[in-house]
Amino acid sequence: MAAHLNPLSAIAVPPARPDETYGCEGPEGPIRFVGLKRLLGAADFPKAGDRHAGLAAATETEREAARSILAGLTIAHLHQRPLCTADGRVDDVMRVNYDIDADVYGEIAGLTIGGLKDRLLAGSGEEALRLGRGLTGVTAAAVAKLCDIHELVLVARRIVHPTRARTLLGARGTLSSRLQPNHPTDDPRGITLLIWWGLSMAAGDALIGVNPAIDTVANVSAVLRLLDGIRRQAGAPTQICVLSHIKTQLAALEEGAPVEILFQSLAGTEATLTAEFDVTVALLDRGWEAMRAHGPLKDSAAQFMYFETGQGSEFSYGRHDGIDMTTTEALCYGLARRYDPFMINNVTGFIGPETHADNFELLVASLQDLFLAKLLGLPMGIGSCYTLHAGSGLEGQQATTELLAAAGATYFMDVALNTDRMLAYFDTSAHDNQTLREIHGREPAGEFLAWCLGRGILARDAAGAVVRGPEWGRPERFCESSEELAELVAATPALHGFETAGPRPADAVSRRVRFHQAVGRGAVHLPLDVERLRAIHPVREIATAAATHEAHLASPGLGTRPTGAALASLNAEPFAVQVLISDGLSAAAVHHNLPDLLPLLLEGLSAKGIGVGVPLVARHGRVKLAEPVGEHLGADLVIHLIGERPGGDALASRSLSAYLVYRVPAEQRGDAARASGNVDIRHEVTVISNIYSAGLPPVEAAAQIVEKTGQILACRAAGNRLEGMLAAKC
């Protein structure tokens, strides 16, 4: 555990410098790159996000020229040129990255980036860890861009950096997993079943962690207590976490909830971290201090923080400050390093084709992430994932995880049958984790292994090797009766069978899983039928800048902007609320939920005396389309009903979300800025998700949206600020 956190004011950062031109002679004349950001972007493997941002090299020749130039620059050259914001400021994420070991930096400052790569390849894992303490995220990213696949794997595999809570995570020879029992409505029965199933397959030694569908203090506290009770009942030596916003977790901790590991998603630019994630470095510092003083494991755990990252979030929000995806990801790791976390993992691939178009881009990015995080001294796990609207899939994910296991990934996810029932994406499973252990000769964390051996989940063969035991894959052993098991099963969607073949799902189970994925992929490409909506209620149609379905999928920013003609057709209206309907990534979600939801929503708003305009509908819309629409119409609140990306089973491809986008008035912006840390805040958002028949039924969703709309208008706040105000009144 770090003894203290350096004040940001005490971290020395070189002054900003004007952009310089880097160049070399090419076969057809000089090749030039203006600015270090442009050079770093051009030197990387080509990826969709960098291409869309105009940062990727145009040709392979240009890419290799950039790499050659970069290889010849010294560590000091990069160190002395912090990558700044558009207005020339060193943001707080960049500043934290300069909190390095000055002695190590002084020793290696004169090395070129190519020389650093050679030294890493020739040295030990211990030496790589030592050198990493003298590097910023930018410098680490530079050397990663020079590495081929073998080199990324080789260096990462050598580095071992264990951390400890209840279990020792990341010891040599181990491969752990985070058990992720997400449920679309946080139903305790479904969460319980998924935990029993994961534990029965020796998953969860890193963490049992739920991404909550409902991010309120009351719900997060309830889920934490559920996890705590299940862990105690099983006696499993692991730790628990609910991956809600850090503000929610800290409020739950203050109320006595068992927040054993504190979680937060990170971003590599302050603009993304603050404006999109509602987080500041000061807030992260406060969380670290609170856990050190009051965390349930404070007297036994050496570490207690957990972070998630992933290439592309800064680009997808349009807040990358001209920095490529690998470098912003490395800056996330430099920020995480400040808190000496118990665990950290990426979810590169979670966003979609706008950042990573295919399996190869995901493979390269994931290997870079592992290399970077381990070099910077972090206990790196991997969320090797894909979505159904991208050009990646299961076989590409499996090839990636094989290489990541060879490269020494600390842990993977356990998402049952690869299918996240709440977040609508696909990740590794307990079947995958056990398969990788058997292929690569790995074991769970030692304390957890002993528990598994004692339960018959794992066993030792005649030679002493760890093998699957007689109770492996039998979740019913944790239930008191067949009736209890049946009740848990009935409450859990996307259960295609418990049958196994060795460490893998039985073929009949795999066939059902793959069929449902195929149905989900089809839903992505279903066109929105506006006439079906008009049959429910009159609507006004507006167009977005995404002129085609292909452009909509590849460039989501287009779906956030109405066309000029669309805006010209709209005039300010005297209604506090507007309803906007978009297909998003599933027109099926709109078609199946709006017949029940929309009439009840409009009736409920009218019954509360809330004025609402004629609903608008947009093909190829994205979440942030609500902001310019609300601004143009002068609405206080836009209720954006939008199709979620398909995932889970075939039924889940009908899942809808309601984004309640509140336009913060000028007189409220001071309060909103103080609550969020974002001085430029203009909108606050409350989300109600997983609206479909097997999640939150549309009739119930309509009532929730009406209730939340009333709260937003009464309190003149939304999102985390609203929840804080509501909690203070209780």
Enumerate the predicted regions with their spans.
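Hydrophobic faces of well-ordered beta-strands that scaffold small-molecule active sites
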Residues: 173-182, 205-210, 236-244, 260-265, ...
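C-terminal functional extensions of proteins
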Residues: 646-730
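Long, compositionally biased, glycine/small-hydrophobic-enriched stretches that function as flexible linkers
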Residues: 2-160, 480-490
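Alpha-helix-loop-beta-strand connector modules within alpha/beta enzyme cores
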Residues: 154-157, 171-172, 177, 217-245, ...
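Active-site mouth loops of central-metabolism enzymes
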Residues: 175-190, 315-325, 386-395
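Active-site loop/lid in soluble adenylation, ligation, and acyl-transfer enzymes
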Residues: 486-567, 725-728
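N-terminal small/glycine-rich loop or linker at the start of catalytic domains
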Residues: 86-88, 92, 160-183, 303-318, ...
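Glycine-rich, proline-tolerant flexible connector loops at the mouths of alpha/beta enzymes
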Residues: 131-132, 143, 147, 207-225, ...
